[in-house]
């Protein structure tokens, strides 16, 4: 009943009582038990009994005002979740248990989500492939001899395999976008500050601001539901900001396409070598976008 359903559809089933929260949680837990041993996407997880008890409690204390009410969630193992170690995939951090949640983790829990575990990451969040000495490799969801990308490969694979409805991540140089592309899902690296993080008020120590929380989802509509929960200003992030509109209610009208600008790096001014067929495919798509009045800015950074 729940397989291939969008998050919006699952939320609707919960609200109309066509599916209990326990049923939704069990659906995802069964998929985790079946597929995660080979995918290694979720690397820390609560005891099943504890998760199901949380689901039963939410069924009893139903609150449809909370947008993620009853959805099982897992955060990237670079983000802090109380009760789980934040290991970053690094053996030296295997016993580090945070005393408070990351901001976007708190927001998911406050919105009714059930935090069940942590998703795998490249070691210390650095790398184009998701592998580390603590938990090992997360392979591609479509074949275990291919890469899942990095560093949010656990999240990308978990979302693609329907082990999670959607997932948070972090992105510095493609860490949400690359795993999403490799898993045929959507990945988003927002403007730094849209998704808040605990940062120092010393602006000199924040520059350059490269890394930011991000997210992954199977559809843009699913992602909008998560973004509406985790985006927005926070007093402990000096660069954070809020938007006036809801992501769910935002549509780009035809007349607004001419205002969209895309920066294209290509081979980074000759510093990176890519497969010529890949570059040709991208250039064809850029030509198509330009014909639709989208502005393409061809960038040649000095590296």
Q: Where do the protein language model's features map onto the residues?
A:
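An N-terminal boundary/leader segment
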Residues: 1-46, 50-53, 291-293
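Short glycine/serine-rich loop segments
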Residues: 101-230
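Flexible, glycine/charged-enriched surface loops at secondary-structure junctions
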Residues: 68, 235-241, 290-302
